[in-house]
Amino acid sequence: MEAKMNKIDTNVVELEIKVDAKDFNEALKKSYNKNSKKFNIPGFRKGKVPMNMVKKFYGVEVLFDDAINACIDKTYGVALEENNVRPVDYPQIEVVEVGEGKDLVYKAKVTTYPEVTLGDYKGLEVEEVSYEVKDEDIEKQLADMQARNARVETKEEGTVENGNIAVIDFKGFIDDVAFEGGEGKDYPLEIGSGSFIDNFEEQLIGLKVGESKDVNVTFPEAYGKEDLNGKPAKFEVTVKEIKVKELPALDDEFAKEVSEFDTLEELKADLKEKAVKANELRAKREMEEKVINAVVDNAKVEIPEAMINREVENMVRDLEMRLGQQGLSLEQYYEFTGSTEDKMKSYMKENAERKVKTDLVMSAVTEAEAIEATEEELKAKAEEVAKMYSNGAETEKMVDLLLNAQRAALELDVKREKTLKMLFESLK
């Protein structure tokens, strides 16, 4: 086998690969053996037609396709390795010369991984990020805990007020025609929650049990249903019951009921400690994003369209999987959002391009700094992942499984973490 490489465009090369006539003839024999049962010639049993008779009656060309594919499978990868070509996508194959007793010559047009030109990535200046935990943050958490543990009781007298729960029957109309999905019975609507269309809940304030009212609203332009987007609607609403939330007192007894602590002060201290840790993690992630963005912005790389398209497809598959976990399909998602597959892919393209560039640039930094993952680091990362999904004896099994089946992914994670650490340590 011989292979020559020509660069024909940015990130595109053409390999001209020659397979010796002897090897091609062997491939023809294998093609004959593979397809022998398909040939029917009078005087011969099925599957027993000699190769020379097949060539005579059908023409040797009938064996070419499988023979050519076998030769490509055997030589294409070798040609890539010999010429240090890293392909992004499947090649475009063109057969140049083919014939029995002749060399097979074919061309493979290959889109390659782009070359990254790194800019400054050490000694960068990035504004520090930090978040303070305020007393009102803890008070809000306590208020949320109160609301979750509130008793709900029927309001015997009075009218609907903000914060009440109005149990309602409703039916929606557009142009005096009832629309699908616009009807509900005994629906508990918390006034002020913002769970219904803007200005719906406010119009119920002041109503008594048994009273009805026409509530006029306008659906948002991007409501998610084409037949409702931006349209005015009328809802016939009847209040059937009014309920109020009785909040528990914020005291030591409350702390004992909702946590493992004996006093309210201990609960507050725990909430604050967790909030501090959460803010530190949030700040760290934002700092990481700032550093990565700076490194990526300083680098230059021409990204092949094939890489962007592949990332878009990955994003679509990821969305489809997440929707499936909620019992939804992509088609339902398009209907709810008023989108289409083409619109969604177009929307995703910018983010896909940024992600591809980020991955390429960060990998280039890792390579430039000769950052490697040790066996100990890989095992530690595997243990970290395993503990998230298992415990006890199962953890050890999962560690072994990860080290074998997901080694490349673990290595990528470790290298990325070490690269980020190096970038942080070099900040001014």
Curated annotation (Swiss-Prot):
Give the originating organism.
Clostridium perfringens (strain SM101 / Type A)
Main location class: cytoplasm
Q: Which reaction does it catalyse?
A: [protein]-peptidylproline (omega=180) = [protein]-peptidylproline (omega=0)
Query: HAMAP family annotated for this entry?
Result: Trigger_factor_Tig (MF_00303)
- Tell me the GO BP annotations in alphabetical order: 'de novo' cotranslational protein folding; cell division; chaperone-mediated protein folding; protein transport; protein unfolding
Q: Which family does it belong to?
A: Belongs to the FKBP-type PPIase family. Tig subfamily.
Q: In its UniProt entry, what is this protein called?
A: Trigger factor
- Tell me the lineage of the source organism: Bacteria, Bacillati, Bacillota, Clostridia, Eubacteriales
Q: What is known of its domains?
A: Consists of 3 domains; the N-terminus binds the ribosome, the middle domain has PPIase activity, while the C-terminus has intrinsic chaperone activity on its own.
